[in-house]
Amino acid sequence: MSGHSKWATTKHKKAVIDARRGKMFARLIKNIEVAARVGGGDPAGNPTLYDAIQKAKKSSVPNENIERARKRGAGEEAGGADWQTITYEGYAPNGVAVLIECLTDNRNRAASEVRVAMTRNGGTMADPGSVSYLFSRKGVVTCEKNGLTEDDILAAVLDAGAEEVEDLGDSFEIICEPTDLVAVRTALQDAGIDYDSAEAGFQPSVTVPLDADGAQKVMRLVDALEDSDDVQDVWTNADIPDEILAQIEE
């Protein structure tokens, strides 16, 4: 359905406002540092690091900050934190499933902040596995239209493992298995098509349709979670119509 993104309403990637710019930069920097630590500091041999750097550049993170994060992660420069990835599960109002991915150097602080945000905004924590089974790990690549058609994108990425191409109005989203993420991104580059981001995330198998009131409650909870410096990403299985999402974001 044109203009409607299952991925975007799942992940709730709203337009970044100035007040959140610092938090966004910090999250992107942490991604670079962790990617360099896990897979090495050479982007040419570490696709995850390459994509993290490209995403940071697209978001206008200064090159000096990017390079310092890469060096810290690779051990070329002192000062890197011991980042740990932790996933919490829970329910938002209206029975909406929530996955919260944290990247933190303090597990107790992260757990406390997530719990407080959930409790104060009508959410409840859930046991591990009780929510995650509703989601599948997927790769998603986004690119601007720039005069391209859906057929142009399909022709470039179909043989690379793309499962689905969604028309979002001004851009396209390409869904694939996480293991095909590099192949899909590379296929776009080989076809001369610029991409905005390439990352792995979660896509729901079942969604919960929401009206305006329900959508506001869920988005309020998501905003509270994303206010934590330890929270990297929040995914839900909420199905929010485009017109309602637009009203909330105004």
From Swiss-Prot:
The lineage of its organism: Bacteria, Bacillati, Actinomycetota, Actinomycetes, Mycobacteriales. GO terms for molecular function: DNA binding. It comes from Mycobacterium avium (strain 104). The keyword Aminoacyl-tRNA synthetase does not apply. It holds the Pfam family TACO1_YebC_N. Keywords: Cytoplasm, DNA-binding, Transcription, Transcription regulation. GO terms for biological process: regulation of DNA-templated transcription. It is found in: Cytoplasm. Belongs to the TACO1 family. This is Probable transcriptional regulatory protein MAV_3481. Its main location: cytoplasm. It comes from the Bacteria. One of its GO terms (cellular component) is cytosol.
